[in-house]
Amino acid sequence: MERRFIVYYNCSDCACGRYVSSLLTMSGAYVNVCVCIVFFILVYLSSCYNMRVLGFLRVCIYLYKLCR
């Protein structure tokens, strides 16, 4: 049960999205991209491959819209 919770946390892109959103008001876009890359690596090392791709693409699209 505990392991399932940890895997679910790694799979969700919610953590990365919220963290990047909170940083947007404090720092520049480059810092946010670096933070998201770190999250992407962490999720990449987990066992959930579909969610890591979807989450990373979602955050990248979100950052792309903000930069335009």
From Swiss-Prot:
Keywords: Host endoplasmic reticulum, Host membrane, Membrane, Transmembrane, Transmembrane helix. It is found in: Host endoplasmic reticulum membrane. It is a single-pass membrane protein. One of its GO terms (cellular component) is host cell endoplasmic reticulum membrane. Its main location: host cell. The chain crosses the membrane at residues 23-43. Belongs to the virgaviridae suppressor of RNA silencing family. Suppressor of RNA-mediated gene silencing, also known as post-transcriptional gene silencing (PTGS), a mechanism of plant viral defense that performs sequence-specific inhibition of viral mRNAs expression. The RNA silencing suppression activity is variable depending on the origin of the isolate. This is Suppressor of RNA silencing.
